[in-house]
């Protein structure tokens, strides 16, 4: 049964990386995304500890493949990004954080906390690419080193045009 679960998981990240990503929130144990989707099942392989990502485990394979198009949490983060009123931005982000089991932050912490919330909220979905592209990030959290970063060339954000799009145009 354990082997079957490993094969059906969408992501099996290193546990030390997961712990670091979620501890940035001020205590990983409180964040329900960590508590319910990542901390419950771990295993060791070749001297490393890994977490099983169980966010979309459900009754059938279709449920496991579902990724929401847009969710309320994204709306709060987008509102935080675009509002010019710092107090309003803080309120939006704090609404999200409180609903994730985290403590509120001050207005001086909004910018750094927002990126961390995008990372935690979209963890394992492949959607973080679009945040990084929009912000033109050249350094992102490493997937292999809990305290490291990975340098990204901005050209990596430019996707090739499919042949089918240019053949008849």
Describe the residue ranges of each PLM region.
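Acidic/polar-rich alpha-helix caps and helix-coil junctions
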Residues: 1-13, 23-169
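A surface-exposed, glycine/aromatic-enriched loop/edge motif typical of exported proteins
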Residues: 18-19
